[in-house]
Amino acid sequence: MYRSEHILKGLSNQYYRATYKSMGFTTEDLKRPIIGIANAWSECVPGHYNLRQVAQRVKDGIYRAGGTPIEFGVIGGCDGMGQGHDGMHFIMPSRELIANSIESMAQINLFDGLVLLGSCDKIVPGMLMAAARLDIPCIFLPGGPMEGGVEFDGRQAEQTSSTEAYGMLSAGKITEEEYVSLENTACPGCGSCSYLGTANTMCALAEALGMTLPDGGTAPATSAVRMMKAEETGVKIMELVEKNITARQIITDGAVRNAIKACLAMSGSTNAVMHLTAIAYEAELGIKVLNEFDTLSDTTPQLAKMNPACKYSIVDFYKDGGVPRLMENLQSMLETDVMTVTAHTLAENIRDHKYLYPATGLVNHTLDDPFGYTGGVAVLRGNLAPDTGITKPGAFDKSLHHFKGEAICFDSEEAAEEAILAGKVHDGHVVVIRYEEIGRAHV
């Protein structure tokens, strides 16, 4: 019996059917499995700007496979837009709001399955947290990464290039004309930021976790593959519903360990530590994510490298095989018997994957030829971080792995930015920003 039949089947449930029919749903529509589509589309976030089109293709797939899609909206704030002002204090709590609102809508409407559409920093983990709480068939699908912009300072430009350019302008290294020109060429189209920040890390890790279809985590926002993956997602959610493969059958201790290893191997965002911790918490798992990062970092090599660690973008990573290639190269270190949203195991996905592009070896390396012999994310302990701190050694030069300098402390992000722009931060300083904690999020 489908969950939705509790309110849509039988003479006594006419009220619910009449309510849906007021919006044009037919009797036949309401006899099918009801699939919720949680869509974080907005004009506030470039990573979500294409999600209207993505949602339509997901709906096409659901209809084709015998289901009825019902779409609802989800908030989604851009971390970049919140930086440098009080708005940043609202970013982390939004993750919990997203998880709570999706859980609420799914339970109010008794959806039989969920497709989760979002791309950016707090939206991806918030959606995966909701899936883990609900434990119904779910697939997460991002809108895909933005392609790189004009060549600037040795790599394809993106949003952070504008920040760097302001410093270069202040130092007299570029002209005002060059600076203004970059504003129009740094971001050539929609998508999540083209570097490996939190957004693309979490999209890639959703795929490594098994909650996104292969290549669904990193295919570009403007690509045909993105739309193909959307329709395939619509078809596949129906298979998960029919087979009753739920989120907690996929989000297991082994799957989370695989995602941790993928994060270490690609030198992903340090924020992945707290997000994977929260996802594991919502799935009621026993795994201690921070301890696993600490232990596995010593034995997991860095196999992928991209901006900000080098000039290659997340789209270059995708074209060099993306997450499927990374997981294939890591296969001997992974728990490959875990279930995924393909309704097959990770081992079967690796075995059957068809790559669209020939391997270049520029971004994805093998175990025999790693970028580094330890993970690209590390756990720190010491007097500055008695409860641990997280760093990303895979993204900066090895000469900085040991550094001694004078600490210059600020009590807010705004104060630090003001001092930097006023020329008060110099070579040899270690910038410390206090009191910007994440509050009561599950970490």
For every predicted segment, state its role.
Residues 91-100:
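Glycine-rich, highly charged phosphate/nucleotide-binding loops
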